Amino acid sequence: MSGELANYKRLEKVGEGTYGVVYKALDLRPGQGQRVVALKKIRLESEDEGVPSTAIREISLLKELKDDNIVRLYDIVHSDAHKLYLVFEFLDLDLKRYMEGIPKDQPLGADIVKKFMMQLCKGIAYCHSHRILHRDLKPQNLLINKDGNLKLGDFGLARAFGVPLRAYTHEIVTLWYRAPEVLLGGKQYSTGVDTWSIGCIFAEMCNRKPIFSGDSEIDQIFKIFRVLGTPNEAIWPDIVYLPDFKPSFPQWRRKDLSQVVPSLDPRGIDLLDKLLAYDPINRISARRAAIHPYFQES
């Protein structure tokens, strides 16, 4: 089921992800033409217990995901009881770095935003159709290839390994793209957690800065409330069942999204509004988002 570490020649360390170090490597297996791959070393919380078999099963499912908008997982290397390496298609640019490379006073451009959004919605829709959630979507794990197309990375890893509070580097894992049902302590969540994140990324591509940039869970919740208004049972009936919801939360009024994201046309605002619906039941699906009028030629 898993390959051998000797099949890969490490070239250099290229980064540190949520779960461990990422290396640029050569795939030495016959017939692969020495292609360049990303070798992700997974550091597991409980070093003493080894790699859980559930994680291996989950990750094996990810090898079946084959879509233009998803970073391919080529191989799984379980070198010993404690170490796991995932071998992915290599892409050296992510959306965060891509945006940082464009001067802050310049827009990304409406056409680029629309193209990336379409690729993001299609990639998520594909994964959701295979019953796989991402749960940790953010610009850092949206990768851009040399043709300028966007692909989703780190899909399904959250279910296999959990979403840690801190990355193994002790850097706090960002809350900026996290759905309100998760922030409010909900344990039963579904595909809506990813479509919320798409909405946050959409607004960020337009505004060139995060729409909700909290530095703690409560700050994140209040940042959302300040823009979208404090939710109540009328607009989100199940909110009262979320463990961390308090009727005593400060009451903010909703802002007009067209003033929050002024560069977006009315169709774009409508899509953003549907992605950032409070009640996950009312949140647009990725499949429906991909056929929203925003994407039609205007």
Curated annotation (Swiss-Prot):
Residues 8-295 form the Protein kinase domain. SUPFAM superfamilies: Protein kinase-like (PK-like) (SSF56112). The modification N-acetylserine is found at S2. Keywords: Acetylation, ATP-binding, Cell cycle, Cell division, Kinase, Mitosis, Nucleotide-binding, Phosphoprotein, Serine/threonine-protein kinase, Transferase. InterPro entries: CDK, Kinase-like_dom_sf, Prot_kinase_dom, Protein_kinase_ATP_BS, Ser/Thr_kinase_AS. The active site is at D136 (proton acceptor). Forms a stable but non-covalent complex with the CKS1 protein and with a cyclin. This is Cyclin-dependent kinase 1.
